Curated annotation (Swiss-Prot):
PANTHER family attached to this UniProt entry: ABUNDANT PROTEIN, PUTATIVE-RELATED, BURP DOMAIN PROTEIN USPL1-LIKE
The name this protein goes by in its record: Embryonic abundant protein VF30.1
Tissue: Seed.
PROSITE patterns (alphabetical): BURP
Gene Ontology CC terms: extracellular region
Alphabetically ordered keywords of this record: Glycoprotein, Repeat, Secreted, Signal
BURP domain residues: 68-259
Originating organism: Vicia faba (Broad bean)
More details: The USP gene family consists of roughly 10 to 20 members.
Signal peptide: 1-25
Residues with attached carbohydrate: 259
Domain notes: The BURP domain located at the C-terminus has not been identified in non-plant proteins.
Domain of life of the source: Eukaryota
Locations listed in the record: Secreted
Length: 268
């Protein structure tokens, strides 16, 4: 599998987790990527009980995941207001099951309507590879196995809290067909990792209305024939299979891509 070259900037680094290396998962991380702090996105995987006391994606954060737009909208000066569709239930499964199975927005699970089995044991689409992991070691093993190398990087978003109006400052292409790992929206800590086919990933630098600068991982789907037609029409007034469609990825997910530089693993 070939990926586009990833230019790594220090500004793409996630806030790092200030914890000591006491868990076997973090020790395993350090054994593969020495002196590399654990990304905040994956910190839930270190919770001893494997269960939190609340859902990881708060109601005010849902807009990070429910914003659809065109690929040609990704340019400096473009204004975005998060949440241009009210059909959160459709965002959960933006593709029809008959064509692409459970895909890249499954982390928006409503625990009262879906179960982990719906996401982790449902049939996969043709050429789709997915795994549910509940430990940091399992995630590391899965992505290394997929790429056949430890020279990989994880990239994520850092949307500002309580901000939903942004202006694009810069756009950088990350690569094609990345492996996405999403924190499922259940109290039990589970990430769903899968390859996103026929897509291009970008890192978009944004400036919030209060001046806060953030970065957003963005995925553009080039094959939208299996997309939910009602969702597409509500958000963009287009039909499936006509134009590429993009969406932001919220703070509780990351994209794994090859590391073509000599830098340490670096994530936004």
């Amino acid at each position: 599998m070939e990926f586009a070259h990833l230019t790594v900037l220090s500004l793409f680094c996630l806030a790092f987790v200030g914890i000591t290396a006491t868990s076997s998962g973090e020790d395993y991380w350090q054994s593969i990527w020495p002196n590399t702090p654990l990304p905040k996105t994956f910190s839930d995987l270190l919770i001893p009980s494997g269960k939190t006391n609340s859902l990881p994606i708060k109601s005010e954060e849902l807009k990070q995941y429910s914003t659809l737009f065109f690929e040609h909208d990704l340019h400096p000066g473009k204004n975005f207001i998060l949440g241009n569709t009210n059909s959160v239930g459709s965002i959960i499964r933006p593709f029809t099951k008959s064509r692409q199975g459970v895909t890249d927005s499954i982390w928006l699970a409503n625990k009262e309507k879906q179960s982990l089995e719906d996401f982790c044991y449902s049939p996969t689409a043709i050429a789709e590879h997915k795994h549910c992991v509940s430990s940091l070691k399992s995630m590391i093993d899965q992505v290394i196995s997929h790429f056949g190398s430890t020279k990989i990087k994880a990239i994520s978003s850092n949307f500002a809290p309580y901000q939903d109006q942004y202006v694009v400052e810069d756009v950088k292409k990350v690569g094609d067909n990345a492996v996405m790992c999403h924190r499922l929206n259940f109290e039990k800590v589970v990430f769903n990792c899968h390859q996103v086919r026929d897509t291009t990933a970008y890192v978009v630098s944004l400036v919030a209305s209060d001046g806060t600068k953030t970065k957003a991982l963005t995925v553009c789907h080039h094959d939208t024939r299996g997309m939910n037609p009602e969702l597409l029409y509500e958000a963009l007034e287009v039909t499936p299979g006509t134009v590429p469609v993009c969406h932001f990825i919220g703070n509780k997910a990351a994209a794994w891509v090859p590391n073509h530089t000599a830098d340490n693993l670096c994530v936004m």
